[in-house]
Design a protein with these regions (language model features):
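C-type cytochrome heme c attachment motif
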Residues: 72-79, 139
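N-terminal targeting signals for export/organelle localization
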Residues: 1-47, 171
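Short, ordered coil/turn segments that flank beta-strands lining enzyme active or ligand-binding pockets
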Residues: 49-51, 145
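Hydrophobic beta-strand anchors of alpha/beta hydrolase catalytic cores
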Residues: 66-67, 94, 140
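Short active-site neighborhood of thiol/selenol oxidoreductases, capturing the structured segment around
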Residues: 56-75
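Generic structural signal for well-ordered beta-strand positions
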Residues: 54-57, 150
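Thiol/disulfide oxidoreductase modules built on the thioredoxin-like
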Residues: 7, 111-116, 123-170
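Structural microenvironment flanking redox-active thiols in thiol-disulfide oxidoreductases
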Residues: 78-114, 124-130
Length: 171
């Protein structure tokens, strides 16, 4: 009996290790809980790129559209630029939100990598990012015709990711 009691801590350690490794192998670090999926897009008034009065409340946006948070300082954002340009050429409406960025830097970024956006809004303080629940950039939201967020992607879009977002809009 005492031999089994002596082995109990070792068995518990092995069991915990198996659970931890199992979780780590199944967990995709790019998939984050998306609290807003299934809910209306947040009501956030953002200033257009280049200045002006905040005039475009994102919560009034009706889809199907993609809302893409990006930054000129973000290397992964540059990686996804070709996928966004391909979506634009297919007629997909994309609204860009320049996250924690300055207008001149955003304009240079768009000249360098292309401008796939129908509208470009700015979030220099990151407040809209908080309201949308982003954890970094790039992040892309698919919004259906009723203004409801139907999908979210928290990494650079690939052509396959873009297709998946478009399929979620078609449902």
């Amino acid at each position: 009996m005492s031999r089994w009691l002596a082995l109990l801590p070792a068995l518990a350690l092995v069991a915990l290790t198996v659970l931890f490794v199992g979780y780590a192998l199944r967990h995709d670090p790019h998939v984050r809980p998306a609290a807003l999926v299934g809910k209306a897009a947040p009501q956030t008034a953002l200033r257009p790129l280049g200045g002006g009065v905040p005039r475009i409340p994102t919560g009034t946006v009706r889809g199907p559209i993609l809302v893409n948070f990006f930054g000129s300082w973000c290397a992964p954002c540059a990686e996804e630029a070709p996928a966004l340009m391909a979506l634009k050429s297919e007629g997909v409406t994309i609204v860009g939100v320049a996250y924690k960025d300055q207008d001149p830097n955003t304009q240079t970024y768009l000249r360098t990598y292309g401008d796939p956006y129908q509208a470009i809004l700015t979030d220099p303080t990151g407040r809209a990012g908080v309201e949308w629940g982003i954890s970094g950039v790039p992040e892309t939201f698919a919004i259906d015709a009723s203004g409801r967020i139907v999908a979210k992607r928290s990494e650079p879009l690939t052509p396959q990711d873009a297709q998946s977002l478009l399929e979620s809009l078609a449902r």
